[in-house]
Amino acid sequence: MRLILLCVGRCKAGPETELSQRYIERANAAGRALGFPRVELREFDESRAREPALRKAAEAKTILASLSPGARLVALDESGALVSSREFSAFLGKTRDEGAPALTLAIGGADGLSGEILEAASPIVSFGRMTFPHQLVRIMAAEQLYRAMTILAGHPYHRD
C-alpha cells in the first residue's frame, strides 16, 4: 500500500525539511518488507485567495483531485481523535490488509483543512489540542509513519 503525505505549503530547505526527509527515508527502508513500498511526499502551494474560507476551499479541490482511486484519506487536524502510536500502527496495518491501494495523510496550510476534507476523511487524527505549524506537523507525521513501521516489524524503536 502506498503511503502519501500530502502537504499544503512547501517547506524551504533547512532543518525541518531535512528531519522530515530523514524520517521518510527510515519509513521507506522499514516499510518495504511490510507491504509499504514507499512514503511519497507531495507538496503544493497554499492558495492566494484573500479570504480563509476561499483559501481552504481551493486547497480542498487540490487535495481531492490528487487522491488516487480507492485511496483512503486521513486528515490531520486538531479537532480529530487522539490516538496512540500503537493504535495508528494498527490502523495502517489493517488498512493495508483490507487491500487499500493507498493511504493519504493530509496536512492543511496556515488556515487548516476545509470542512469538505474533514467530511471526506476517515479518520481525522489529532496530534493534540494545541495548534502546530504545518512544517512541524509534517515532521511529526513522518516520524509517526516510521514509528508505525517499527511497531509492525517488532523493532524496539517504540517503547511503551
From Swiss-Prot:
Which reaction(s) are listed as its catalytic activity? Answer: pseudouridine(1915) in 23S rRNA + S-adenosyl-L-methionine = N(3)-methylpseudouridine(1915) in 23S rRNA + S-adenosyl-L-homocysteine + H(+)
State the Gene Ontology terms under molecular function: rRNA (pseudouridine-N3-)-methyltransferase activity
Spell out the Pfam families in the cross-references.
SPOUT_MTase
- Gene Ontology cellular component? cytoplasm
Primary enzyme class: transferase
Q: Which residues bind S-adenosyl-L-methionine?
A: 76, 108, 127-132
Q: Which family does it belong to?
A: Belongs to the RNA methyltransferase RlmH family.
The entry's function note states: Specifically methylates the pseudouridine at position 1915 (m3Psi1915) in 23S rRNA.
Protein's recorded name: Ribosomal RNA large subunit methyltransferase H
| Gene from which the chain derives | rlmH
